[in-house]
């Protein structure tokens, strides 16, 4: 579904939504409309959409998380037995820190023989780079993508290197991220963004981070250390 802007859903993605009998959208609560659903409704009627509760933010209790996943997988399996084609909408790309990968494994076990296809999507880091003007990579520069939920140490190790570092899901650890950027001398060129393409969009220099919590899905780009001139690393 892309990062949230309905105009960034690919043509192939739109076709998949329209060709499906039902479209499953992941939510934390059946009464809450998530970002994936809000995007989907630009392309299919509401009666075609089915909300399924996933443990999207459950990190404290593995047993409860696995039970929630089993329940969600069971619900999607029911839909697959009742319909020829079921689409699952996920923001970003289905193979990048996505709910979809876990669901696909569950469905493969519950409904053997199900043909599972994925449609690539535009990621938040691509959208933030385009909107902020931050260049993700040049020449031989490496690119490291880190979920801040993995811990501040992992982020600091990435920032200590020469390449571009992208941090996902850093909103709740904004203070720790700002400290890591300052300690590694990477804060001046870094930029963060949230709700990209939506009315509440925010794109700011990382130097403005003041320790206040940000939206969970906030994304940060710390560009590579670039000393040479144009084309110097080709």
Regions found by a protein language model. Name each.
Residues 1-6, 11-115, 178, 200-204, ...:
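Class I S-adenosyl-L-methionine
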Residues 4, 28-31, 54-56, 122, ...:
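Short, acidic/turn-prone active-site loops that include or flank metal/cofactor-
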Residues 21, 84, 133, 162-163:
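Residue-level detector of structured alpha->beta connecting loops
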Residues 49-51, 116, 145, 190-192:
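Conserved beta-strand scaffold positions in the cores of enzyme catalytic domains, especially
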Residues 62-71, 131-134, 158-161, 203-209:
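Short, surface-exposed amphipathic charged segments that create phosphate/polyanion-binding patches used
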Residues 68-78, 134-147, 209-219:
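A polyampholytic, Gly/Pro-enriched intrinsically disordered region
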Residues 81, 158-234:
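A contiguous loop/helix-start segment that scaffolds small-molecule binding in enzyme catalytic cores
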Residues 92, 96-161, 211, 225-228:
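Class I SAM-dependent methyltransferase SAM-binding "motif I" and its flanking Rossmann-like core
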